[in-house]
């Protein structure tokens, strides 16, 4: 067993299961995706550390604990069509791709888009499509989505993203107040429920001027 493979198993035991993420599908998906592929060579020693990993200036992979707990909140179904917002190098998209039917990986930074387009096929993520665009606008051409997954802390949830949810669709995000929440479209209205406490790096552009404060 390689050192990274051992670290991956330890991640599941020491960062995922121990934090009340009990879904075996999440364990299997995170255990199958080689997180080190998505981290710059100089930072691969941090690939499985319980901290966000900066993959480009101001762009991060979420720490495994927070990421796993967000996946659990999302209740990803095998039939889900997913929009993965701020996918960075594509790690979150690769994991989501093992849980859902299809994933659109949205990233604003051109260099990260190029990196994700190279890494994801090599990681076997055949049901993930990478696209470049403004994060707060989502990707209307692929809507509606059953799940929108936001990889970063935000002040607000933009109306443009909520409008792209299918009936019964969920949006999972960590608010800058330090609370993870799920927003659900039901009968044309948006409701929300609080999850767990979390502090993760902020996403640029998600300010109070582009949507409602919840």
Language-model-derived ranges and their functions:
Residues 1-83, 91-94, 99, 112-126, ...:
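Class I SAM-dependent transferase core
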Residues 75-190:
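Conserved nucleotide-cofactor-binding alpha/beta core module
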Residues 214:
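Catalytic, metal-anchored helix/loop core of enzyme active sites in primary metabolism
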